[in-house]
């Protein structure tokens, strides 16, 4: 196809102008850290402190003080069951990235396989792992991620989430087919992209069907759908 010099010049200038309007990328990587250095390379199999050929199967009994009356750990009312989601025990729900116990202030992609921090540090773009699945077999999508942020920042969730994510102004789906979603920040903060990575991802279909928090009409002990390594088989 032939293009006139005039058209080609106009196209190049227009394209260059468009590029200037898009957020510049500070870096794109499989993980992030506050100082910009990572211990583990892209494609690493396991953390050094993990036994990669650990025996599978058997029975593990864990204990916790007190009782529980709900299976949703993200609401204020009630007491959730131990191990659903937490800093040390996230057996049911997963986050966009996971921290390394032998490396301070670093996180590696879990549900997200690629992390791109904008040059102005006012947004971060996540590309989801196409192999990520919930326990019901459905894929983890950008719609689930957006639903999670919107829900956790709403009055339906525990107030601590509103405070923690207050500087994340919006989750914007950029490419549904490619699994790309951008978190926009209200102000530059060197820790915000790490904070965003710590957000648990909820199953939109499950909580739309059964409700969330005060809007839920389901049994509070209904086993949840998560993407973590374990499922809740039954509640006694």
Predicted regions span which residues?
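N-terminal secretory signal peptides that target proteins for export/translocation
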Residues: 1-8
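Surface-exposed binding/hinge segments that line
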Residues: 2, 127, 162-210, 229-234
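Bacterial N-terminal signal peptides
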Residues: 11-24
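N-terminal lobe/hinge region of extracytoplasmic solute-binding protein
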Residues: 29-119, 150, 211, 222-233
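A short, structured loop/turn motif at beta-sheet edges
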Residues: 56, 118-121, 173-180
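Solvent-exposed loop/turn segments at secondary-structure junctions
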Residues: 66-70, 131-133, 152-155, 188-191
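Periplasmic solute-binding protein
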Residues: 117-132
